[in-house]
Structures are given as C-alpha cells and as structure tokens.
C-alpha cells in the first residue's frame, strides 16, 4: 500500500544512511529507496530532509533516484508457519529467497514472512454467539508435531460477539472468524516490531529456566521470564553456550538471533538442530525453533531490525501462553551498528563512540522480557539471554556495563579457563544470579530441601580454594594445613566433576536436576568422610589416595548412573573405614 503518490528524491548517500528531500513521511515509516526499491526505514526528519537507514547495500545508487513511502511501520507477519523458519533481520524467509534467486541474493528482492499459499487446518475453540475480547484465543492449528499454534484476536481489535467461525483448511489470508462489530480476522496478524505487545500484568518470576548445564542450573540459575548476559572475549565459548541453551533449555519455543556474528555459526545451528531430539517431546529441536540469521557481512542497519524482529516473534508466542527463550548473539554487534549509524548521522558520540542513547536502547530490548499474564489469560514468559563480545575481554567497556545494569544474571566467560580447556568457561567467582532468593522455594519443593545448603557449601569451598591458590602456587599444597589440603582436593573435584561439562558427549551434554543433586551429594559425602578421617589422625596423603573417587567421573558419562553411584558410595565407606581402623 503506497500512500504517497509523489516520491521523494535522493539527495545524499553515506553508506547505509541516505537522505531524501520532499518525502511526506512519518518516523519509522518503511520506504523503498532508489530504482531497485531497497527497503529502508525513516529514522530522522529535519525540515524537508528525511534521513533513512537502508536494510540492504546501497552500492550503486545515486542522488536523483526516487524514494517511495509505503506509509507502513516495519512490521512482522505473525501466524502459522513461523516455526522451523530461517529469516533475515527483516523477516524475509531465506529459503524462499534462495528458491527465487539462488545462493547469491540480489538487492531489492523481497518475500512475505509467511507462506500465503499453504493451507493449515484450523480448529475453532469458540462458538457462534460467544463474546470474544482482544488477545483471546479463538482457534488452534497443529503447526509442528510438538507445538499447537493458537490463533488470537489481534490485540488492538474491538472484540464482540462471534457471528461466524469456520473450521477446516485455510491459508493465512482467508477469513476464519467474523464478529458483530463488523470485524473479521484471518489466521495471520501484523505487528510493528518497535512496539511491545500488550499484556494484562507482569509478575515476578519464580520458576527456573532449566538448561541442563550444571554450573547454570546449580549455581547461577535464570528464571523463566528473566534476563541474562554472557560476556566474554573471543574464543571463550559464548556461541557454544548460547547453542547449548537453545538446544536444552526447557522453554517451549526458542528464538535464536545470530546478530552480526559469523555465518559458520548459523550453519552449525542449521545442520545440528534438525538432528537433535527435544528431551521433553522426542521430536526434532528445529520444530520449536525460529532462526534469524543476520551475519557479520550483512548490512549493519538490519542488525538492529533483527533484534526487534526476534523479540516481537517471542512476544507473540508468549501471548499464546508459551515459555519462550530468546538468544541474541551478539548484542555488541548490534551496538556497533548503532555506533556506525550514529556517526553517519553526525550525532554527538558518547563513551567510546557509542551513541548517548545506548543504555536506553538496550533497556528497551531487555525490558520486553518477563513473566506476564497475557490478554488471553494464564501465563507466558520471554527469557532473554544476550551474548556480549567486549573487545579484548574488557568488561568495563560501555556495552557490557550498560547490559549489567539491566540484566539480573551474569555468566562471565573467562579466557583463562578456556585456555585450560575448562568448559563451559564460566568464572564461578565473577558470575552471579539475582534470582536465587526467588527460586529457593522451587528448589526446596521440587528437588530437595538440601539443595540450597549444598549450593552455599559448594560456593564457600570454591571461594576458599581461590584464597588458598596463591599460597599453593608459591610453596605447593604440601605446605598447607591438613584440613586445607583436603579443601583443595574437594574444590578440584567440584571443578572437574561438576563444573566442567562436555557439550559434545551424548550423555554429559544435558544433566537434569536429580542427577545434579546426586553429584552434589557424592562430592559432599567424600568431603565429610575425608574431614572425619583427618580429624581421626589419618594423614592427608592416604585420604587423597582413596581409589573410589577415581570412579566418580563415570557418573557424568553414564546414562543409568545409579549403580555406578552405589558402587562409589560402597567403595568410599569401605576404604575410609579401613583407614580409620
């Protein structure tokens, strides 16, 4: 729909930012730039000059070419067909573009976000005469084997009594419900990406988003509807950690945004996810996943769009009552895109050249996470996990600092740990979770009343080891008092048995809470027996030589680990009894 018959004229081109004159447009209108009709968005209006950020390469366009205003905001199509898709930053389906153009996609090519030809089986859940309100669920579509797509009345509709509702096979454009207010709706709706979708109320999160990663679930958990940041230098494992979370977190829907990172990483996700099984349903992980690929060689302006597109898709599934996990890899690349556009606009730079509005844009994004009561009732959540790539691993740079002010969970990746081949390379002394107090009741009721005590003891031992490490490096562990020699050994077991996890091992890649509790207790049992033996006068050299502890790593890599655990407990009891005899 083109509302402005008179096109504007291109006056100035500076990389992804172009200026047009005599264009009748509003802020954030989508425009078509040049003879090739490249997609752009109005970001500044100064008198007769309209400044536009272009979502495709501007190479080859020149002043004098026309600019056409569509009169629409940048919006995404929401409806059946989103899951299993791979989009670019402005919701163009890459698979459809490949069919149109081949592997090298020309500029100006576009395609709708959803397949408008495919028919979906619509099952109504309301009847003629029922009163419906905005956001209410009126029907269902079995989109994949795992996920039922719930069709909702658009949030800005008036609502009213149902006068007609159809059942059967329809495309996303065909009308499925009519109301006495004169409104009628298809299965698809559109929503502008920069506007958060409405809800009734936001709640305080109280259930953990379980990830199957021991260091995260055990020591630094994130809640469903929470926010987390994963900052770390190059090669410390940000992307692998994000991929592990996308694979194994117990969210029902996963939105994975590759924002300005390497193309190979998106390829890995595309090749691995279809082969992996969802531990809850047994179906392919791809069936609950939406991928947004905006790699580092794509135009910078589209990075910002990709983040907003991703969070809008996540909010849509949240409104159906699903728990959604959104991975943004990496928010630093988005901030760099903002910095580049800020400098093209000749705005006053803030710290390190980033725009002065960096923190407000980051807040805008992270604040769209949360556990909410949707308009349809019930509850739904969006958990946001953003990777941050500080140059040289410097956590004092603006993107990391502004992110830490907003998020409540900090998983600090450490290059020293990754160089020692300790993965996931999350530093247990720097990381924190501010959700612990809210989640304590869940762990007490659903896992064990001992969980929180064991976790506190675990952290105390790791802190103690860090304090002793300086002495050990200077004079060796033999110079320490006997109890502290045992503490060093227990901390080593914690690091190697519990905190280290092999993402490429079919068993160790995912560890549920009951198994984590058993591993906590196994290490605690050894520690209690060791301290008791030392108090009874057994020398540390004999305590540290107990053979049963050499069997402990088998627990990590064995699916049916209970017999192994029983054997370890029996071995420890017998050996410590013999030492004290």
Curated annotation (Swiss-Prot):
Disulfide bonds: none
Catalysed transformations (reactions): ATP + H2O + 4 H(+)(in) = ADP + phosphate + 5 H(+)(out)
Pfam families: ATP-synt_ab, ATP-synt_ab_N, ATP-synt_ab_Xtn, ATP-synt_VA_C
Listed GO CC annotations: plasma membrane
Predominant subcellular localization, coarse grouping: membrane
UniProt GO molecular function: ATP binding; proton-transporting ATP synthase activity, rotational mechanism; proton-transporting ATPase activity, rotational mechanism
Binding site for ATP: 232-239
Keywords associated with the record: ATP synthesis, ATP-binding, Cell membrane, Hydrogen ion transport, Ion transport, Membrane, Nucleotide-binding, Translocase, Transport
GO BP, sorted A to Z: proton motive force-driven plasma membrane ATP synthesis
SUPFAM superfamilies: C-terminal domain of alpha and beta subunits of F1 ATP synthase, N-terminal domain of alpha and beta subunits of F1 ATP synthase, P-loop containing nucleoside triphosphate hydrolases
HAMAP family: ATP_synth_A_arch
Similarity field: Belongs to the ATPase alpha/beta chains family.
PANTHER family in alphabetical order: H(+)-TRANSPORTING TWO-SECTOR ATPASE, V-TYPE PROTON ATPASE CATALYTIC SUBUNIT A
Subunit structure: Has multiple subunits with at least A(3), B(3), C, D, E, F, H, I and proteolipid K(x).
Function of the molecule: Component of the A-type ATP synthase that produces ATP from ADP in the presence of a proton gradient across the membrane. The A chain is the catalytic subunit.
Protein name, entry field: A-type ATP synthase subunit A
Upper lineage: Archaea, Methanobacteriati, Methanobacteriota, Stenosarchaea group, Methanomicrobia
